[in-house]
């Protein structure tokens, strides 16, 4: 009798642990799909343009430094405004950064440019006064970048 009571208690404990794990997993999936919707909703173009301007340096030689600086600053502000429309969570910020990387991957001409882009991209949250993701894999699937 004591053995069956212990067995029933153990079985109940396993079921509770499994249900708790499933609930946590569903919550994570819900967070992820919420982030995906948010990333789809915001305009990441200003962020892409801001980072490309930073890594390309002087693109138009006839522009004065002040004009280029103002344009880059405007792009950064527009980028930060767009990112501010999303939840400031590690997961959502990482998904936004991943999307920017994926969108610009084909424009990055060599390995050095890819590394510069990733560095600037990881600095973007701090530039906007957001929390930076602790871990964020910016490698694009398919090995393109």
From Swiss-Prot:
Residues 1-21 form the signal peptide. Keywords: Allergen, Disulfide bond, IgE-binding protein, Seed storage protein, Signal, Storage protein. Disulfide bonds join 35-92, 47-79, 80-128, 94-136, 105-145. Expressed in seeds. Not expressed in roots, pegs (budding ovaries) or leaves. GO terms for molecular function: IgE binding; nutrient reservoir activity. SMART domains: AAI. Induction: Repressed by water stress. InterPro entries: Bifun_inhib/LTP/seed_sf (IPR036312), Bifunc_inhib/LTP/seed_store (IPR016140), Napin/2SS/CON (IPR000617). Belongs to the 2S seed storage albumins family. This is Conglutin.
């Amino acid at each position: 009798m004591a053995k069956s009571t212990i067995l029933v208690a153990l079985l109940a404990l396993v079921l509770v642990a499994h249900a708790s794990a499933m609930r946590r997993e569903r919550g994570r999936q819900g967070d992820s799909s919420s982030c995906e919707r948010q990333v789809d909703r915001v305009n990441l173009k200003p962020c892409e343009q801001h980072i490309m301007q930073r890594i390309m340096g002087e693109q138009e030689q006839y522009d004065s430094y002040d004009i280029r600086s103002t344009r880059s600053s405007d792009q950064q502000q527009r980028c930060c405004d767009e990112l501010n429309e999303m939840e400031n969570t590690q997961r959502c910020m990482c998904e936004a950064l991943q999307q920017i990387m994926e969108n610009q991957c084909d424009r990055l001409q060599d390995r050095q440019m890819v590394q510069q882009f990733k560095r600037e991209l990881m600095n973007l949250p701090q530039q906007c006064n957001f929390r930076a993701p602790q871990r964020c894999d910016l490698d694009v699937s398919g090995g393109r970048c």
